[in-house]
Amino acid sequence: SENIQRAKRIFAQAMQKNDYHASYNYCYCTKSSHYSFILHEALKNDIHIETSSAYDIPIVEKLIAEGRLAKDSYILCNGFKRGKYIDYIARLINTGHPNTIPIIDNEDEIDYLCQAIDRPCEIGIRIASEEEPKFTFYTSRLGIKYRDIAPLYRRVIKNHPKVRLKMLHFFINAGIKDSAYYWNELLKCLK
């Protein structure tokens, strides 16, 4: 609770200082701890949830059933989406949880999701940075390269009857080492 409140204070101060009038929504990443007593404590702070695997969705559904997670809370579904994870995300959407937002890592996930849902939903796009990889391969699990986002939006999402773009999820695989690097990557994406 202390860390959540501290993060909320820092964002509130930064938003006020920069005359930014949108809202800040803290999302607790369930992979940081699945223990019920930690989730229950976190949820006392008016937060939202971020999932990263099929394992997380039944936990989220239980929190909703217990009344601990509001029906209008955001559930950001990150991570590689295949099989059971897509089915579980679709179940949340199809049973009327309106703020379930799958964060798409690749175009195939849009196809899999749309086959599983029976109503329109909002999605996010996970933006991969152009960082120097520490490995010799690139996987789509790391997100969609910034230069591919606008073409993907125009070609697949813009007129799609089942999905609407809600957010861009900026992702740096190695974490943010310094603010200059972060702002450089963000500016490249925005251009």
Show the residue positions of the predicted features:
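Low-complexity, highly charged intrinsically disordered N-terminal segments
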Residues: 1-19
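Active-site-proximal beta-alpha core segment in soluble small-molecule metabolic enzymes
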Residues: 24-190
